[in-house]
Amino acid sequence: MKRVINKVIVRVLLTALVTAVPVMLVCQTTSDGSMPQYYFQNFTPGQVKLKGGQVQTPLLNYNTVTEKMVFARDAKYYDISNPEMIDTVLVMGTRFVPVGRIFYEVLLTGPTALFIQHKGELMSAGKQVGYGGTSQLASSVYVTSVELSGGRYNLPLPADFIVKITPVYWIRRNNEMSSFLTEKQFINLYPERAKEIKAFIKGNRIKIENREHLKKLVNFCSSLE
């Protein structure tokens, strides 16, 4: 009897996590059937770990345009609309955590934690401008999401479009979040250690855009504190 009650509770919690209004799959595909707004190529079984300890395994993907976790069921998409109930989401070995109403990818945990915010912009694929070239500037039509009641999003995408993704890096130190995009911005987060960090970057040929390099750099900075 207890097991049946637990299953009912988990089912109710999962229902609360998804929006009531679905987004049809066909509305978010391009002419070739691809969905470039999504971080992963396909929806795959993932894990949604709730703060209460329950775990669900729906088909998941991450929408880089809305920065929301998306749940697929019966050929429809649902935004996970109550991220405050979630502890962690795992998709294909990648860990995400809620930050406000959106999700960040986790690269490092510990006293200094490292995250990536995947920010996607939808824009038209561009017009032909001669010699077989394509100009995005000639037809840059950005598509914005439309917020509906309850924080739900529906993206009316054009037939052909591209997604420009800009990674924003975040570190959490002393319970404070700080963002950076470049090496210089990262060094500015540690003004008292700038000389040592510059030497480490040069000596180890660190490239900020390489996540393994970045993890190594953050671990080094943590060792200085």
Predicted regions and their residues:
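Bacterial Sec-dependent N-terminal signal peptides
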Residues: M1-S31, L217
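Short coil-to-beta-strand transition motifs
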Residues: K49-V55
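Short, solvent-exposed mixed-charge patches
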Residues: L224-E225
